[in-house]
Amino acid sequence: MTERLLRYFRDKQQDVQSEKTYDTQCPFCSMQCKMQLVEQTIVTRKKYTAIGIDNPTTQGRLCIKGMNAHQHALNSSRITRPLLKKNGEFMPVSWEEALNHIKDQVTMIQTEHGHDAMAVYGSASITNEEAYLLGKFARVGLQTKYIDYNGRLCMSAAATAANQTFGADRGLTNPLSDIPHTRVIILAGTNIAECQPTIMPYFEKAKENGAYFIAIDPRETATTKIADLHLKIKPGTDAALANGLVKIIIDEQLINEDFIQSRTNGFEELKQHTDSLDLNDIAEQTSVSLVDIRKAAVKFAKETSGMLFTARGIEQQTDGTAAVKGFLNMVLITGKIGKPYSGYGAITGQGNGQGAREHGQKADQLPGYRSIENEEHRAHIAKVWGIHQDELPRKGVSAYEMMEKINDGDIKGLFLMCSNPAVSSPNANLVKKALRRLTFFVAIDLFISETAKYADVILPASSYLEDEGTMTNVEGRVTLREASRPCPGEAKHDWQIICDLASALGKGRYFSYTSAEDIFNELREASRGGIADYSGISYGRLRREGGIHWPCPESDHPGTGRLFTESFAHPDQKAALSVIPNEPPVPKEKPTADYPLYLTTGRVMSHYLTGVQTRKSAALAARHFESFMEIHPQTAATYNIEDRVLVKIESPRGSITVRSKLSEQIRKDTVFVPIHWADAQNVNDLIGEALDPACKMPGFKVCAVRIIPI
């Protein structure tokens, strides 16, 4: 009898009493994989299962992060009511009290110090509608010039390089479906297998079809394993390597003369520059043998088709823009763009890293990828917004420079949405000091993050399960993510929060939207005629078609999967070749007697950005529950460091403590630390404040450090 009862109760615990399905897409990387979350109620508990859904980009694939994304969205530590700091403690309050307090504080600051005493810090993880609205809120609601976003720390070098070279910036110039058919692929500073795993089947298919892979990375990674040739470069020397590759292609007459003559400018200047370079010097500077540099250059040039992919490895440097432009020189002089199976891809890191940089939350930008300093562009947006052109503020400063202005006392108040600069910024100790200096700080987030804890008010935002709007993936394909689950407690859609803030500040007439679709329809008009033209895209089309590449200027336009087939986006329709110095204009830190090792940073598969979301996921956190320092065994031996012991890492900015991980996959002069942890494990406490002069990207990938066993 007892055994039968136990069996009965065990079986009962497996009975599904009810089941709900939520259609959504992954909130993490730029592939934006479509999925369903299945919620099963079993007695008194709930069980969740994520299922990949077939779509044009990833054909139903999910990675480990996507499979477990719901764990942070459903986490009990979610903020579900507005929080107001009273006597140093956060207390739940009504929306009315929170908004009235915000109105009073913002009014006081701007009355005393002017409109530009307030600033806005955005995110590349929010929807296109929210990015658009945040830019409008800064410039119309607050009338401040100070707005930028965390994508400045992620995509700004690649975006600036593409704009300067091609006249337009889109993650991929050609569709992902080209990858399996191309003949040669360069992966420069990208660890796709861990950062965007659902792209890897495209590369694996290319490998099966005989493509030759060249990887450029100071580490051996899951991605470099696919390579036929791995250039294990010294950190920070990517621009010099690009020059060496270009020089060999020119010197050995492997260029596409017809393409250069008809579709580019600047070749003679480029050739004069490369003529002055010494390949032996480049080999020594980069620590890559001349034999391997030549092998890579010749292979890329001689194949009939080829693709170049870059990511943060070469972009997050103080000459990241120049390094990317150097590699784009190679694409252009071989004519490998604007035709099938050839092109360039900047592998976008954040979920909406593409769309978020197109529609106005950047310091120098207006919607549609327009410039805030261009009078025609200003007039167009002012008309859409119903304001006078002169009311539009001018250009502001970059994300890190905003923090410097806060620290200097020029900016008194801050609105921050879905970002964590106390962890993600370089010289993070200065950022934390700056946040403490703010007169007033409002954070809009899911959790009390390492940054939000400094806020005076925290407003509860929506997760990917509850939020609604469009996202633009790595190939420039706009997709629709509809709200499938109600917000918990008193949390609201992010766009609703922005509208409520504008209304509280007396600007509600400019923000009278009733849905994300309302906002998107205005965004379409704002983008009309711009580089990133969404005017022909509608929610109805996205529901029917599953995604549309921009530019899409008409409702019957199919979208543009391949860019630059006949012309580039500069006024003369030609691409610009660039002269790139081997040494950057802003000197990079190099090892010294006091700080004898290079530090470089990056990601691991189970975590995302600063880890605020993934550290809330039990399944993901269990895979990597703490940070680590990857170090070569021979280097470790010189410091008497064994595997999995605590080590202090110091730079001129600060110190952190992490656990050692001995690995022969890294250079002997370099250590690697991932970016996903905070406090005593926050590697960005070590990173310098120097910025790329072209795009204001910090130099995350190169830092001089010393290590001390504990």
From Swiss-Prot:
Any one GO BP annotation for this protein: denitrification pathway
CDD domains, alphabetized: MopB_CT_Fdh-Nap-like, MopB_Nitrate-R-NapA-like
Binding annotation for [4Fe-4S] cluster: 26, 29, 33, 63
Cofactor note: Binds 1 [4Fe-4S] cluster. Binds 1 molybdenum-bis(molybdopterin guanine dinucleotide) (Mo-bis-MGD) cofactor per subunit.
Superkingdom of this protein's organism: Bacteria
Pathway(s) the chain acts in: Nitrogen metabolism; nitrate reduction (denitrification); dinitrogen from nitrate: step 1/4
Keywords per UniProt: 4Fe-4S, Iron, Iron-sulfur, Metal-binding, Molybdenum, Nitrate assimilation, Oxidoreductase
Stimuli inducing this protein: Positively regulated by TnrA under nitrogen-limited conditions.
Cofactor: [4Fe-4S] cluster; Mo-bis(molybdopterin guanine dinucleotide)
EC annotation from Swiss-Prot or TrEMBL: 1.7.-.-
Keyword Iron attached: yes
Domain 4Fe-4S Mo/W bis-MGD-type: from-to ranges: 19-77
Matching InterPro entries: Asp_de-COase-like_dom_sf (IPR009010), MoPterin_dinucl-bd_dom (IPR006657), Mopterin_OxRdtase (IPR006656), Mopterin_OxRdtase_4Fe-4S_dom (IPR006963), Mopterin_OxRdtase_prok_CS (IPR006655), MopterinOxRdtase_cofactor_BS (IPR027467), Prok_molybdopt-oxidoreductase (IPR050123)
PROSITE patterns, per database record: 4FE4S_MOW_BIS_MGD (PS51669), MOLYBDOPTERIN_PROK_1 (PS00551), MOLYBDOPTERIN_PROK_2 (PS00490)
MF (Gene Ontology): 4 iron, 4 sulfur cluster binding; metal ion binding; molybdopterin cofactor binding; oxidoreductase activity
Reported function: Nitrate reductase is a key enzyme involved in the first step of nitrate assimilation in plants, fungi and bacteria.
UniProt cross-references to NCBIfam families, sorted A to Z: AssmNtatRedNasC (NF047855)
Protein name, as recorded: Assimilatory nitrate reductase catalytic subunit
Biological source species: Bacillus subtilis (strain 168)
